Swiss-Prot record:
Pfam family, one: adh_short_C2
PANTHER family the record matches: DIHYDROMONAPTERIN REDUCTASE (PTHR43639:SF6), OXIDOREDUCTASE, SHORT-CHAIN DEHYDROGENASE/REDUCTASE FAMILY (AFU_ORTHOLOGUE AFUA_5G02870) (PTHR43639)
Keywords of this entry: NADP, One-carbon metabolism, Oxidoreductase
GO biological process: one-carbon metabolic process
Catalysed reactions, as listed in the record: (6S)-5,6,7,8-tetrahydrofolate + NADP(+) = 7,8-dihydrofolate + NADPH + H(+); 7,8-dihydromonapterin + NADPH + H(+) = 5,6,7,8-tetrahydromonapterin + NADP(+)
Transmembrane helix as UniProt keyword: no
Species for this entry: Klebsiella pneumoniae subsp. pneumoniae (strain ATCC 700721 / MGH 78578)
Regions that span the bilayer: none
Cystine pairings recorded for this chain: none
Domain of life: Bacteria
Classification via SUPFAM superfamilies: NAD(P)-binding Rossmann-fold domains (SSF51735)
UniProt protein name: Dihydromonapterin reductase
The gene coding this protein: folM
Length: 240
């Protein structure tokens, strides 16, 4: 009998930073990976060379989201997990209509996960008890809000709430959890003053790197019991 191939993990927004690191993490485990990307960063070529199936996607419209879902279904009839990492960042500022800001934030952080979870549900089901996972990457601002990024915080809070709703809908076959990170890694252009200021906002005073997220996801994938929960990865920042 031929050995059964593992089901792919789908990661949205894997062109850089945490999404990119997660894709390489699972590829190193010989786990098939499907990624979405919006911008063709050079790192996408590296993912292809490492064995990932890389699909360009436009989540700025519902049609674009559903077209991507159909593309995924054309390549596989089962998924091990969906990691909703695709994200956008837009502040309320003069000259930009508020409706533009809220619609853009809700489109990427709410419409995309909502539609994809429904469209790809059948690919996650049918593999046994707690055999599949959905991970929503939210943000620590879900807990405290943001006066400068109100729409962003609201959209991530909606995604956090959907975690519990989908956990109820998809149990016991599929576990659904959220991860709410604060500072995980710096950008190359961040100067020393900014870095120190950012580090001082948490109790642990480090930028832990992407491994902190991949280790947590490994645990959640292994668990057969944990679902409907949000895990803060913030170094104790709310306690400062």
């Amino acid at each position: 009998m031929a050995e059964q191939q593992p089901r792919p993990i789908l990661i949205t927004g894997a062109g850089r930073r945490i999404g990119l690191a997660l894709a390489h993490h699972f590829l190193q485990q010989r786990q098939p990976v499907i990624v979405s990307y919006r911008t063709p960063y050079p790192a996408i070529d590296g993912l292809r060379e490492a064995g990932a199936l890389c699909l360009q996607a436009d989540f700025s419209s519902d049609d674009g989201i559903l077209t991507f879902a159909e593309a995924v279904k054309s390549h596989t009839d089962g998924l091990r997990a969906i990691i909703h990492n695709a994200s956008d960042w837009m502040a309320e500022k003069p000259g930009v209509p508020l409706s533009t800001v809220i619609n853009r934030m809700m489109q990427i952080h709410v419409h995309a996960p909502y539609l994809l979870n429904h469209a790809l549900e059948a690919l996650l089901r049918g593999h046994g008890h707690a055999a599949s996972d959905i991970i929503h990457i939210t943000d620590y601002v879900v807990e405290r809000g943001s006066d400068k990024h109100i729409a962003y915080a609201a959209s991530k809070a909606a995604l956090d709430n959907m975690t519990r709703s989908f956990a109820r809908k998809l149990a016991p076959e599929v576990k659904v959890n959220a991860i709410a990170p604060s500072l995980i890694m710096f950008n190359e252009g961040d100067d020393e003053a900014y870095r120190q200021q950012a580090l001082d906002k948490s109790l642990m005073k480090i930028a832990p790197g992407e491994k902190e997220i991949s280790d947590l996801i490994d645990y959640l994938f292994t668990s057969r019991y944990v679902t409907g929960r949000s895990f803060a990865v913030d170094g104790g920042r709310p306690l400062r």
